[in-house]
Amino acid sequence: NIIVTLFVTAAAAVPQTGAAQKAAYNTPGAGNPILPGYFADPTIKKFGDTYYIYATTDGSGAGFGPAQLWCSKDFKNWTLMPMNWPDSHWIWAPDVMQNEADGKYYYLYCQPCKLHLGVGDTPRGPWKNVLGESEAVLVPDRFVKNAITLDGQTFRDDDGSVYMYWGTWGIYKGFGCGAGKLNPDMKSFSETKLIPNTEVTHFFEAPFVFKRNGIYYFLYSCEHCEDASYRVDYATAKSPLGPYTYHGTILKTNADGTVHGPGHNSVLQEGDNYYIVYHRHDNPHSNRGFHRQVAIDKLEFNADGTIKEVIPTHEGLDLKPEMKVAKNLAFGAKVTASSYYDNDFRPEYAVDDNNGTLWRPRTTGPAWIQLDLGKKQSIKSIWTQFEYGTQFYQYLIETSNDGKHWQTFSDKRQNRLAGSPMVDFGNAKAQYIRLTYTGGQKNGFGGAIWNIKVYGSVEDSAPQQWLGLTAADFDGTTWHNNEGMLAGKFSLLQGTALRERMAGKDAITLQPGTQLVMTHPQLGKTRKHTLTAQAFDNGSWHQIDENDPRLNLSEGKLEILAGEKQFTLTNLRYYNWEQEAAEKAFDAQSSIVREAVADKNCQGLVVDISADYYNEGD
């Protein structure tokens, strides 16, 4: 491996609290993109005090990925959270709305070419299809004549009425956008119609409707999503279903092409302020436009209600300036690495607090990156944002005072939990930090990193599953927390435990008097949390929580105890937040998914080539 030492350039001196005016895409501290990863077709919502972004998982070439959402309370630190539904990995352009009539949340997503609608009790679900069967279709293709079904979005009017809009390839003569008014049952339509492309000129896909001062605004995307022609146009009307009047383009590729192909937007309203959230292509631009990232800019209006042209930025926006974040000790640190792919993926990009820049090693095998904090400092939390938050990564974090002698800070070399950020806790006083990537979930992806953030305080605000243990994680004496965020394990202090299959579940059985213990300073009763497990008692499985004496939670420690009777359990979960009743009920009936580790022997460079790239003689 080539060992490269790089020093952060003068650009890194930009204060962490805000990027310089007219920031470039690679300016340290730039606020756009707002998410660390490849996500497209974003719908942003605010429920209560929390922002949610629902988006297509990108970067795979076909929008394949698990059901997920991003959430944040401060609009600065975003956490990726898994959802139970859809159980397909083909989930495009998701949208969530809350229905005032029943208080429920409704989750809309599409597959080509159909729409599915789910219902749940929280913005996170758990979801189930409103029509019963998981794959039941609410809006099939050509449900409205000459409207190709894709990219569904909901709109709730002031009177509580709910409307739905959908469509793609609406450019043909006589085609356009499908639309309809939903019945109160949210399963059928009282009215449907075509909004023709003679009203929404150049309509291609991604309709989004919002209302301001009695005017209905219909925003949509035009041209080709894979190149610079992609843009956002809009039209207005006096009623939700039109007729609409076309007004032109409001968002397009910028002059230097670093905001490339912006489109498929949603709109967030905060008081009298409006913001447009959209995707754009990554920098440098990947082939075929399948590595999109989410950005935000302000949406402003003229006195007559027309929308001003949006000038897309790399600065982004701080919607919650009153909410301060802890100092990131890694920002602008001196960096060394085992290798880097080329100058577009330099190691210092891992310490620049910029979701649009990435350190990528030259190989997809083991790799390391080392940070020099400049002096010995207290280190209690390290957040790592790997390239693909929906895949798990395996890694080791170490600290050192001299760069030669290393102590383990967090060992996740057996990790099987996907997430972003990956959060690791410890208590070190050191100048150097080294993260070594050892493997992952998928072949050929490697250990690329958007950002490494280091804190001198315990930063535990990301809502995550801290413990996740299945029977497969038990080796006879140790129960490894491989599906949980906290690095650690349960140790057998006394007695005997064994793996066995019981009534359809793989489990571990503790013989009478057996004790398993895990210690970690983040465990405890005083902070918000949810602790559950599935236990086998009296011939059947049921859910238990910390009120069961066999789960003894105290500050810094969790004990699993078998008293006079044997204790059979599996799917032990501990969240650092309080679950809603519906979420607990779902966990009671479901098992932790244990993903396979990529075959190390198959790792190598990835080739993606098709006839589209053929030129005569080349």
Predicted regions mapped to residue ranges:
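Extracellular glycan-recognition surfaces and repeat-rich motifs
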Residues: 339-348, 355, 477-507
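Beta-rich carbohydrate-recognition and catalytic domains
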Residues: 21-201, 211-257, 272-273, 279-323
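Non-cytosolic beta-sandwich-type ligand-binding/adhesion modules
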Residues: 72, 117-122, 229-238, 377, ...
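Extracellular carbohydrate-recognition regions
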Residues: 313-340, 460-491, 531-533, 584, ...
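Secreted extracellular polysaccharide-interacting domains
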Residues: 420-421, 509-524, 541
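Flexible glycan-contacting loops in extracellular carbohydrate-active proteins
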Residues: 547-564
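Aromatic, loop-rich ligand-recognition surfaces of beta-strand-rich domains
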Residues: 351-463, 571
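Substrate-binding cleft of secreted/luminal carbohydrate-active enzymes
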Residues: 586-617
